[in-house]
């Protein structure tokens, strides 16, 4: 085990402070509508230009190991806030820095760090309760567009596209962000359930121009087994042929004699049919097939349930208004499953999402939920250069997370005003005469910083702006985009409650932990081995100028 370097007491905390200040300052320059960009060098390709706090934080690594520990802890604040709320990373970083700086002064003056931590925790509880009381639900498309615009650094196009996407696919719908081929940022919406499996044979195509099979008012046969023998299918095919309706077969595989017979019947016009491979793999495939069966009102044909293909009747098949199949995707629109069954299935999936510990599983469950509930929207981000594309795509993703947070917990006035309005509640908080009251004062000072920093980044005097906001009431605050004092809610300067809450909770949690730190342990830097004896002594002087 390598030797360790250990720092104690005040020197340890001061090293943490230097790391916290370095990272926080790099991130804080991006705060607000007039925040500046940060250019980040990449080991290959063009540098990244960003105004996203968490992107800046993730790139920072300091040379001093003790200072780096402080920076990494604040980086954790930004990452956690981004993961939980999708935005507010810069605010969280500014709050964490202020709480730690103010707390450190008090610890140096001899106050008890544990009592300070308790005071900070009590104050945060009061502020969170105030934010919830201040919160109002989003009222339709305009509120969502405003939240998206602010999170996308004032880009109204992004805000409007996200609002439109949410309106079309609903709160539970999946909205994905992809890179467009052109310069325009556009929205594509897929109605109904779509899965990434196309037709088993191009002979099933009904529209040669678009190379897709369109089935109007079809029956849907769902099975998790492989179909190779035609004999299994004959009874159900005869019933479907008599009904005159098209048929979509979703199976693990349709091959051999069965596929050949289906193709021949399709070409002769005897049967309007299309076969596709079942989506997913393993257990996920079984669940997706159950989703399709529930949506269309059919039954999954599974040997373990004692259901066989040859025993199927029309009542066991699903129905849909329209199904389109191309070489890559199948889309089922208006499945005719019972509403109660679909809602029960949705409830089961929601329960699984809450219990899931895996990010990947949760994402897949969320996709399944969206497909059952009503659709998928794709925002195609367009830009002139790759650098601009990356920056714009990151802003769209941030804005998307922020709008979801707004829909979930509502909105509060932006610009740091919601925090300032909670100061009155903190002044009434009684924690006795001990050091806890100083912990409350730490939070009081920290809550002024988001509004102060937004004003400073816009070229105003921060403390003067904060005092003027405190003289007002309700949503009255400083709109840095227009350099005016006004009702921020009416001006569309709003923040998701979840973002404001999460930023404060994460900042206070990490900063108060750092305050109670008394020792730091890090690996000692290894001494670089001295250059070899005289190995290069006889070489020509020109070697000295070479780069290694």
Swiss-Prot record:
Its EC number is 5.6.1.7. ATP binds at residues 30-33, 51, 87-91, 415, 479-481, 495. CDD domains: GroEL (cd03344). It comes from the Bacteria. Its main location: cytoplasm. InterPro entries: Chaperonin_Cpn60_CS, Cpn60/GroEL, Cpn60/GroEL/TCP-1, GroEL-like_apical_dom_sf, GROEL-like_equatorial_sf, TCP-1-like_intermed_sf. It catalyses: ATP + H2O + a folded polypeptide = ADP + phosphate + an unfolded polypeptide. GO terms for biological process: protein refolding. Keywords: ATP-binding, Chaperone, Cytoplasm, Isomerase, Nucleotide-binding. It is found in: Cytoplasm. One of its GO terms (molecular function) is ATP-dependent protein folding chaperone. GO terms for cellular component: cytoplasm. Belongs to the chaperonin (HSP60) family. Together with its co-chaperonin GroES, plays an essential role in assisting protein folding. The GroEL-GroES system forms a nano-cage that allows encapsulation of the non-native substrate proteins and provides a physical environment optimized to promote and accelerate protein folding. Forms a cylinder of 14 subunits composed of two heptameric rings stacked back-to-back. Interacts with the co-chaperonin GroES. NCBIfam families: GroEL, PRK00013.1, PRK12849.1, PRK12850.1, PRK12851.1. This is Chaperonin GroEL 1. It comes from Anaeromyxobacter dehalogenans (strain 2CP-C). The gene is groEL1.
